[in-house]
Amino acid sequence: MEEEVRLMKGNEAIAHAAIRYGADGYFGYPITPQSEVLETLAELRPWETTGMTVLQAESEVAAINMVYGGAATGRAAMTSSSSPGVSLKQEGISYLAASELPALIVNVMRGGPGLGTIQPSQADYFQATKGGGHGDYHLIVLAPATVQEMTDFVGLGFDLAFKYRTPSMILADGVVGQMMEKVVLPPQRPRRTDEQIRQQCPWACLLYT
């Protein structure tokens, strides 16, 4: 796929950008206001084009642990959720940080506390920037103000996560996730081969044949 100009929602842009980055896997669970990420990936069917795995897990806890397993093999794995769903993922995120594994987490925030509302919110700032889960760690946090930044931060988030071997988060809110803007989608990048992963990620748990 070449560079392309489209009109789309921020959540849809996340899905398109993940495919075009060459992501290996997305594992998620529906929750308003970010469900379009998973819905768009299901519609685009990247497993038939790039070989990207897309799976709706049985829960948020299962989804983040699937990301954990993918990240341990050096794959570009990601998930997305919204505020209470991200809270359920915190133990898995903490384990990713402890294991020094790269991963991308997208939080399209909604109001809280508790189950909260489906209205947009920016209330998860401290949870995201101060670590969230137990232990002494900090995420790399990218906060988009536009749909274009939602797109650009997918590649940047993955690149920073692999550079520093730590999870990174795109911290958006329901407004950016739902509003539509013109977006310049980047050209398609190929997924890395096993040999490239072995060279670039010597820490990865890959089978040697």
Regions inferred by a protein language model and the residue ranges of each:
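Thiamine diphosphate
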Residues: 1-131, 138, 174
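Proline-rich intrinsically disordered, low-complexity coils
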Residues: 30-33, 102, 113, 144, ...
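Short, solvent-exposed amphipathic alpha-helical segments in soluble enzyme
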Residues: 42-44, 94-97, 155-160, 185-188
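Short, solvent-exposed polar/charged micro-motifs at secondary-structure junctions
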Residues: 65-66, 152, 180-181
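Conserved thiamine diphosphate
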Residues: 120-174, 198-200
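Conformationally flexible catalytic loops at phosphate/diphosphate-handling active centers
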Residues: 165-207
